[in-house]
Amino acid sequence: MAARYDRAITVFSPDGHLFQVEYAQEAVKKGSTAVGIRGKDIVVLGVEKKSVAKLQEERTVRKICALDEHVCMAFAGLTADARIVINRARVECQSHRLTVEDPVTVEYITRYIATLKQRYTQSNGRRPFGISALIVGFDFDGTPRLYQTDPSGTYHAWKANAIGRSAKTVREFLEKNYTDEAIASDNDAIKLAIKALLEVVQSGGKNIELAVIRRNQPLKILESKEIETLVAEIEKEKEEEAEKKKQKKSS
């Protein structure tokens, strides 16, 4: 009996579950960790990079993609599913520009992606998208935005959030450390994203991918050297803090 609900996308189980949607959410939990931070004049996306094969082109393995000049997205889950969603969202961004002669708001394109995902939970012959996405950008009035969508088609606005394999650990770190002081400058917001990822990424900066959008500026993907420099600064700050604590205890 349970198998019938297990296979059917559009049929609720007696206790109110849509199993295929829940399985899609499990696929997200197996994906690379991604984190989003909303600063005052900046939005930051960081992703845990999986180590690539020796002969593989590194630039072809990207988890952060631009949807428009002022909006970008990071995802956790099935890369092939994400490609479909990204392509559809890019077409919608361009279509909106041509029709309305204005760029999309971040909420508009998030709602479009969430609606697309929701449609795939209610249609026969399809399966839900196995991805969760963090969507960041600036509205044309200069307001920074961060949204998260999941396979069920729900979306919410956040100050900071994480998705993927170790989302719970990273989210707990952000809940403790996200303050106005922690995002006082652009550099502080970037460092907070790196610190959050370093909670779960063991091999330091070389396994982190970072993208930033500043107000009235296009998307910028940070170079590995820039990330390594910031990681070194963070490590130095940690050592100094530990030293101060030692001195306090001894006094």
Swiss-Prot record:
Q: Which GO terms describe its cellular component?
A: cytoplasm; nucleus; proteasome core complex; proteasome core complex, alpha-subunit complex
Q: Which coarse location class applies to the principal site listed for this UniProt protein?
A: cytoplasm
Indicate the segments annotated as coiled coil, or none if absent: none
Q: Which InterPro entries match?
A: Ntn_hydrolases_N, Proteasome_alpha, Proteasome_alpha-type, Proteasome_asu_N, Proteasome_sua/b
Q: Which residues form the signal peptide?
A: none
The listed locations are:
Cytoplasm; Nucleus
Extract one GO BP annotation from the record: ubiquitin-dependent protein catabolic process
- Which of UniProt's keywords are assigned here? Cytoplasm, Nucleus, Proteasome
Q: Which Pfam families match?
A: Proteasome, Proteasome_A_N
Q: List the disulfide bonds.
A: none
Q: How does it assemble?
A: The 26S proteasome consists of a 20S proteasome core and two 19S regulatory subunits. The 20S proteasome core is composed of 28 subunits that are arranged in four stacked rings, resulting in a barrel-shaped structure. The two end rings are each formed by seven alpha subunits, and the two central rings are each formed by seven beta subunits. The catalytic chamber with the active sites is on the inside of the barrel.
What this chain does, per the entry, is described as: The proteasome is a multicatalytic proteinase complex which is characterized by its ability to cleave peptides with Arg, Phe, Tyr, Leu, and Glu adjacent to the leaving group at neutral or slightly basic pH. The proteasome has an ATP-dependent proteolytic activity.
- Assigned protein family: Belongs to the peptidase T1A family.
Q: What is this protein called?
A: Proteasome subunit alpha type-7
Classification from the root reads: Eukaryota, Metazoa, Chordata, Craniata, Vertebrata
